[in-house]
């Protein structure tokens, strides 16, 4: 939803030009030999929540899955995600592709609620992973057993974050850039807040 992308008519900006969105989607599906997934938002703003109108046409373009973020573009990341329209798309009897829900999935309990109350086929976790990459393990364990994992020790968290930095450096190929890249993701981590020299 960022301005530099949406302002050019790309990304969430396509929510203002549905024919173009559908043309691009059809062209990509036709051009590649791998499954295509579309991720979009509820609409451009509160007056244009169009996801229930565009889900079927997107499916008709040949996409394999549809991921829906429960906010409009104008909301950015403010306010709460509205999952009611995601549920409406999922409950549409003409929709036969998997529906992935996204927005405010930050705890194992919320992950379970997304499946139980909104019936989605999968969830997408975003900002909750920043500084807490183990959230996937927490969610999977809770979804499988119904039990929360015990809190991890600070040392365990620090060790994971160190490994993350090492892999970032290896992936980027530059120590300074790898550290800078990692630090911005760790700002939300409880372990990171306790480490002045990290």
PLM regions: where:
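Active-site-proximal loop/short-helix segments
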Residues: 1-9, 69, 133, 138
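Catalytic beta/alpha-barrel core
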Residues: 14-17, 67-69, 101-103
